[in-house]
């Protein structure tokens, strides 16, 4: 299992672009220095009325297949 941590700050306007279909993937830079690409549906459980803000931990299998995403703050 691999773990990657990153901060995410998406405003309500940015989330609306995602919901309107303008983006299917989200690209973030992990604190470990890697560029990570996530399907936007992985962040939906964390969307609030004002957007998505927080510190997250992405867990993947050794071949980088998704296991879980959790907010850790």
Model-derived features: where do they sit?
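Charged, amphipathic alpha-helical segments
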Residues: 1-13, 39-44
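Short acidic/polar alpha-helix capping motifs at helix-coil junctions
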Residues: 7-10, 18-22, 65-67
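Amphipathic, hydrophobic secondary-structure cores in small proteins
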Residues: 16-53, 57-62
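Charged low-complexity stretches with an acidic bias
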Residues: 60-73
């Amino acid at each position: 299992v691999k773990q990657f941590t990153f901060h995410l700050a998406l405003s309500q306007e940015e989330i609306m672009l995602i919901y309107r279909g303008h983006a299917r993937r989200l690209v973030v830079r992990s604190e470990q220095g890697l560029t990570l690409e996530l399907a936007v549906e992985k962040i939906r459980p964390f969307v609030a009325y004002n957007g998505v803000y927080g510190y997250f931990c992405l867990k993947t299998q050794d071949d980088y297949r998704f296991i879980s995403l959790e907010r850790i703050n």
